[in-house]
Amino acid sequence: MSTGPFLGEILRYFVVLLMLAAATAKLRDLAGFRDNLASLFGMGPALRAVAAPAVAVAELAVAVLLLGGLTHAGLLAALLMLGVFTALVGYKFYTQSVVRCGCFGEAERSLSGLDLLRNVLVMAAIGAGLAQPAGLTPPLHVAVLAASLGCLACVVAVHFHEIVHLLSPSDG
């Protein structure tokens, strides 16, 4: 297996795990996510009751597409979802300054420019994945390695804000 398809496999698992992490966080605190939709977008109770689980289900559907062998469709769906979400939340961030997202269950922390940067980096990675040619199904040991590296990338993405702060010089 050449490098391109292997990197594509890593990316596929990365996006699968990222979508599963986002959906799981929302489903674990669906009431909190519904409340967050009200504060972020001013949604009424009826719309929030539908939108909150629909977002989580859409994230799960992207993971299923990617795991089911529809990599191109899954990556396109992930790119579209993340692009729309980042644009909406980015607009709110720049117009209101204090925005709570809670995409990965961190509702107590305000959104920062680092979160938007993370999303842009994830979208760039997805774009790179879309540019990869469709490969053959890798052997099991290659798939396990790709999934492991995708998992590592997912942990870095989910905790990007905290990792950057840990690696930044402190003020004293």
What positions do the PLM features span?
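Membrane-interfacial helix-loop segments of redox and metal-homeostasis proteins
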Residues: M1-D171
